[in-house]
């Protein structure tokens, strides 16, 4: 088993802290305690908290992009959708929500480069969902009520807000409703 470097440990803990508390909900002191280093040494790797969050968004987005790319588009569209939805369902009941969803609620506090990265994350997901819906269209007996790209925005927005509401209400009902909407759309 590979031992993580201090930088990797800082980044991993940051991913968890942001998903639990948001950008303003943790400090370098919190990270220092978790990793067992001095606060000043964190600045060696990430001079500012903005640098740290930018790297966290980059890492989280890269992981999710790889997960999306790994979905085999030769599978039935319902299976593709189920694979895509699995992380959203898994997040329900945990104390962590989507990192980019959490940070999107704090965009007014974040630097412009992070704002752009968050937009890119949303667009990546919406584009993949739109492609899925386009692949499902020929199998449907009726057309979608809105273009696939618009429906993709609705579904992704519903999944993101569903994760936030799941934490608030302690139930996955809203994530399941969004997931059911996508599954019904691709099932025809």
Across the structure, where does each feature detected by a protein language model lie?
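Conserved amphipathic alpha-helical interaction elements at protein-protein interfaces in regulatory
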Residues: 16, 20, 48, 70, ...
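Hydrophobic/aromatic residues within well-ordered alpha-helical segments
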Residues: 49, 56, 60, 64, ...
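Hydrophobic/aromatic-rich alpha-helical bundle segments in the mid-to-C-terminal region
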Residues: 79, 100, 113-124, 137-184
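Helix-turn-helix
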Residues: 9, 13-51, 55
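Generic hydrophobic, amphipathic alpha-helix propensity
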Residues: 3-14, 31, 56-60, 64, ...
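C-terminal alpha-helix
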Residues: 132, 181-188
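Amphipathic alpha-helical segments used for helix-helix packing
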Residues: 93-114
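Hydrophobic alpha-helical connector segments
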Residues: 55, 69-97, 148-155
């Amino acid at each position: 088993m590979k031992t993580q470097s201090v930088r990797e440990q800082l980044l991993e803990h940051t991913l968890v802290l942001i998903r639990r508390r948001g950008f303003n909900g943790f400090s370098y002191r919190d990270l220092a305690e978790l990793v067992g280093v001095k606060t000043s040494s964190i600045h060696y790797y990430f001079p500012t908290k903005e640098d740290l969050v930018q790297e966290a968004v980059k890492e989280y987005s890269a992981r999710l992009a790889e997960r999306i790319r790994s979905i085999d588009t030769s599978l039935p569209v319902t299976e593709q959708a189920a694979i895509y939805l699995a992380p959203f369902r898994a997040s329900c009941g945990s104390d962590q929500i989507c990192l980019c969803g959490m940070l999107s609620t704090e965009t007014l506090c974040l630097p412009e480069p992070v704002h752009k990265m968050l937009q890119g994350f949303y667009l990546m997901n919406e584009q993949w969902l739109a492609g899925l819906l386009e692949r499902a269209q020929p199998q449907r007996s009726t057309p979608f009520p809105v273009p696939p790209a618009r429906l993709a925005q609705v579904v992704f927005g519903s999944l993101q807000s569903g994760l936030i509401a799941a934490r608030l209400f302690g139930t996955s009902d809203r994530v399941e409703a969004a997931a059911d909407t996508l599954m019904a759309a691709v099932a025809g």
